[in-house]
């Protein structure tokens, strides 16, 4: 599961889904996962770290006992271990900056040269998950820049590691 606004939007969408008793095996726990744990949709979340808004962090700290047994923090060597990801049959969800028509994904650099963020564990999950999904808005900069391009300006995830790309257009 990736980090960011799009990932939290997908997690929010799971709140109204027919899916129940889900488990999250991820690198980072975000606001949306706490909401799913509260609602009982998610039974457990295993991760290496938190990436929470100040409000969600304060809420977690004030109700930590309610999350006992539902949140497991593990070393990165375990949470991102390729064999564990593969054995668990994870459905990986990561964000992207751009993807090309061949399925190559750029997760780190804007316009091919300005670093936006690091690759994190997305490579571990993309390559080893049962299903590797990348989610993104179809455009950036008020619709002036397409996230789906003829050829990615930089490639972090090769075509063979990417199975599904989803935008709000489909």
Locations of regions flagged by a protein language model:
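Conserved phosphate- and dinucleotide-binding cores of soluble alpha/beta proteins
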Residues: 1-169
């Amino acid at each position: 599961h990736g980090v960011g606004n799009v990932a939290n939007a997908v997690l929010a969408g799971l709140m109204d889904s027919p899916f129940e008793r889900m488990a999250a095996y991820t690198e980072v726990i975000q606001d949306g996962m706490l909401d799913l744990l509260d609602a009982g949709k998610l039974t457990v979340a295993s991760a290496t770290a938190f990436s929470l808004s100040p409000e969600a962090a304060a809420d977690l700290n004030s109700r930590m006992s309610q999350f006992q047994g539902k949140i497991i923090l593990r070393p990165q060597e375990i949470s991102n271990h390729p064999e564990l990801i593969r054995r668990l049959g994870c459905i990986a969800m990561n964000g992207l900056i751009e993807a090309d028509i061949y399925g190559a994904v750029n997760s780190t650099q804007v316009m091919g040269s300005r670093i936006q963020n690091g690759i994190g564990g997305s490579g571990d999950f993309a390559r080893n998950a049962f299903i590797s999904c990348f989610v993104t808005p179809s455009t950036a900069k008020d619709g002036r820049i397409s996230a789906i391009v003829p050829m990615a300006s930089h490639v972090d995830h090769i075509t063979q590691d990417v199975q599904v790309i989803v935008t709000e257009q489909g």
